[in-house]
Amino acid sequence: MRCSLQFLGVLMFWISGVSGDIVITQDELSNPVTSGESVSISCRSSKSLLYKDGKTYLNWFLQRPGQSPQLLIYLMSTRASGVSDRFSGSGSGTDFTLEISRVKAEDVGVYYCQQLVEYP
């Protein structure tokens, strides 16, 4: 059976910090995705999120309809506890991708990226 799933990536954060502003943008993705396919969601930062400790402070969240956001990926590519290996994160200092393989109906929701380098 083929079912069409809707994914939505959105603009997440404009964070003011002492070193200047970091603007995080996501391309809106609302194209239908067929169950079993793969989908990529991109996120871009106006500044590098590679911190002086060598870690990249970029998180990915999924907010399913009627639920609170769930952490999927932290430090750019580390899956949170209990998150399926169908979810993977990758990227560089400013450009990031969340890849979802073998999409399922339960993956429907709003996907957010978040930076943790600067705080308001």
UniProtKB/Swiss-Prot annotation:
Leader peptide range in chain numbering: 1-20
Annotated Gene Ontology cellular component terms: immunoglobulin complex
Region (Framework-3): 82-113
Region (Framework-1), start-end ranges: 21-43
PROSITE patterns: IG_LIKE
InterPro entries found in the cross-reference section: Ig-like_dom, Ig-like_dom_sf, Ig-like_fold, Ig_V-set, IgV_Light_Chain
Record region (Framework-2): 60-74
Region (Complementarity-determining-3): 114-120
The keyword Ribosomal protein belongs to this UniProt entry's keyword annotation: no
GO biological process annotation, one example: adaptive immune response
Domain of life: Eukaryota
Keywords: Adaptive immunity, Disulfide bond, Immunity, Immunoglobulin, Signal
Keyword flag Signal: yes
Region ranges (Complementarity-determining-2): 75-81
Cysteines engaged in disulfide bonds, as pairs: 43-113
Region feature (Complementarity-determining-1): 44-59
PANTHER family recorded: IMMUNOGLOBULIN LIGHT CHAIN
Name of the protein described by the UniProt record: Immunoglobulin kappa variable 2-112
Highest classification ranks of the organism: Eukaryota, Metazoa, Chordata, Craniata, Vertebrata
